[in-house]
Structure formats: C-alpha cells, structure tokens
Amino acid sequence: MRAVTWAIVAMLLPRVLGAIPTRTPRTGGVGDTLSVAIVCHDLESVEVTWGPGSAHHGLSANLSLEFRYGNQVPQPCPHYFLLDSVRAGCVLPMGKGLLEVVLREGGGAKLFSRKKKASAWLRPRPPWNVTLSWVGDTVAVSCPSHSYPGLEYEVQHRDDFDPEWQSTSAPFCNLTVGGLDPGRCYDFRVRATPQDFYYGPEARPSKWTGVASLQGVGPTGSCTGPTLPRTPGTPTPPLALACGLAVALLTLVLLLALLRMRRVKEALLPGVPDPRGSFPGLFEKHHGNFQAWIADSQAAVPTVPEQDKDDDVIRPQTKGVETQEDDDVIAPGSPCLGGGALMSVGGASFLMGDSGYTTL
C-alpha cells in the first residue's frame, strides 16, 4: 500500500510543481525591468542604450538616466540620443572609479542600475594601419598596438578554395600566418579582443577591419578572381615567359597560314610572264607605249644599201615588143593595181606582171 502511495505522489508531483509560478532571478542591479546595453568605446566614452520605452515595456515615453564615478554626486545624462523622437540612449564621459548607472521612469521609480568599472564594458576600436607582407610561404601581419594592455589580436584568413575563416591570435599586433600557398589569393581581416581575465566576460571584441586580399606572386591587392590549384613545389611560371611562348606560337601559326595561302594562290592563279623579258626597252624608254616601241624597233633593223636603179631593172629581151606608153604606166601608190606578184628589193617594191613591172 505504501509503495502504491509513493508511486502516485511521484506521478503527481511534477504536475503540481509545474503549476506553481516562479520568478526569474535578476542578473543585474536593483529594479531591472528592461534590456539595457552598456559599451565603453576604446576607454574614451561610455554609451548606454535601452529599448523604446512604453512601446515595448509599457513604461512612459522618456526615461531619465543618472550616473556617477566613485563617491561623486549623481549627475543627469549630458547627452541623450533619440530614436523615433523617443529617448533611446545616453553618451557618458570617462572618469575614475566605479561607474554607477541608474535609469528611472520619468525621474521616479528605479528601473535599472549597474555599478562596475567602465572598462568592464570595453569594446576597443578596430586595428588601424594594418600591413600585410609575404615572407616565403607565410604572411606577416603588423599594426600599431592600442594604448592599454589586456588585448589579444586575432587574424583570420581564407582563400577561394576554403571559404571558412581560419584564425591566428597573439597578444601583440605582430604575428605571422604560416602554411600558405603564394600562388593563391587570400583574404585577411584583423580585430582586437579584450581578454576575459583582464576585463571580465562583458567586454566585447572590436569590429573587424576591412577584408584585404593578397597574393604572393603578384602585386599587393592584385587578386582579381579564383586561382587554379598548384602542385606543391611547382613554381609559378613568370608572366613574361608565358607571354613570350604565346607570341611565338601565334607567329608560327600565322607563318603556316601564309604559306598555305601562297600555295593555294599559285594553284588557282598561274603566273603571268613579265613583258620586260620579251620586249626590252618597252617600259624603260617608251613607258609602255607598244606602238612607239614597234616603230623604234623597225627603225633599228639594218637596211640593205640601194644599188643603181638601172641594175635593178629587168628589161625583156623579146623583139618586136614595143614599150608601153606613159599613160599605160600605173603611178606609184595608186590603189588600183593590176595582177601580178609583189616583190621587194632593198628599199623598193615592185609589182611584177606578165608583161612588165611597176615601181611602187
């Protein structure tokens, strides 16, 4: 019977405990009823921000803030900033001693309070003047250190083949990242992180610097796209050598193309003989005037010297044949010539007939 009773109690106890309302313990100061963020920017100023007031927490539109360092008299916020015409935060100056921050509803009930060193909410400025340089297969990263201690500098890098960031950290902004391939393009970024043992868990790291791209075989910032993977130990060919090989290959291709075109042209269009070999002086003396060249060539032919005309006359020896009258003789150059053979002797031409001859 007792065992049954304990079994029933064990079954009902979780339900009874779940029905009892519980209060969430507060993690902050007295009267916390809204979310407040405090940031100490590079130990130069303190920024306190909170929600939009009544729109989220059912409170009055504007809250008031008081602060003091050490045992000073509480002071009102020197500079509020607004969000949608409602107070949303306050910027405080730096001071010595513990910082106490109090938020009130219209100057009455306390809604939030904190009391710590301002450095407990430290957020350093991002590193500046960061320099990256290749040394073999490592990249040296350096930048000026902050004016206060307790920071750790973190460098992250990645390449086009591994998009996940890889981290390297050191207590000073002078560190090296090893195991890199100079033929690849890498992205780098740097930030400063407060150490927990020095500032506490509420300190926040700085923002990342802008991403800088770097490649070992090219000028700084020359990364224009993904690079092809290389076999380890194989040096990257210089750009000049690659360009020279490309030019030589292109020249060889052009020469082969020209030679092939010349052979095709010779097969389709046979060569035309040069008239200078067959007609000497045609172009040198007569400028291509063929008629003038013919006249000059005929004038240069040696002529046979003329003999006595009486020797060239052949007189018929037949008796009883009378000489033709003058009016029967055909004048030289007459277009109406009789029949007979044309004969040239020396520079004279004769038309031979059956009964005589005629001088032309």
From Swiss-Prot:
Tell me what topology the record assigns in the membrane: Single-pass type I membrane protein
Q: List the disulfide bonds.
A: C77-C90, C185-C223
GO terms for biological process? cytokine-mediated signaling pathway; inflammatory response; positive regulation of cell population proliferation; positive regulation of interleukin-5 production; positive regulation of mast cell activation; positive regulation of receptor signaling pathway via STAT
Record keyword Disulfide bond present: yes
- GO MF term list: coreceptor activity; cytokine activity; cytokine receptor activity; protein-containing complex binding
Listed name of the protein: Cytokine receptor-like factor 2
Q: Where is this motif: WSXWS motif?
A: 205-209
The gene behind this protein is Crlf2
- Report domain Fibronectin type-III positions: 123-214
Cytoplasmic side: which ranges? 260-360
Q: Which Gene3D superfamilies match?
A: Immunoglobulins (2.60.40.10)
What taxonomic classification does the UniProt entry list for its organism? Eukaryota, Metazoa, Chordata, Craniata, Vertebrata
Self-association or partners: how does it assemble? Heterodimer of CRLF2 and IL7R.
- Which first-to-last residue range defines the signal peptide? 1-18
- Function field: Receptor for thymic stromal lymphopoietin (TSLP). Forms a functional complex with TSLP and IL7R which is capable of stimulating cell proliferation through activation of STAT3 and STAT5. Also activates JAK2. Implicated in the development of the hematopoietic system.
State which tissues express it: Expressed in all tissues examined including brain, thymus, lung, heart, muscle, stomach, small intestine, liver, kidney, spleen, testis and skin. Highest levels in thymus, liver and testis.
Q: Which organism is it from?
A: Rattus norvegicus
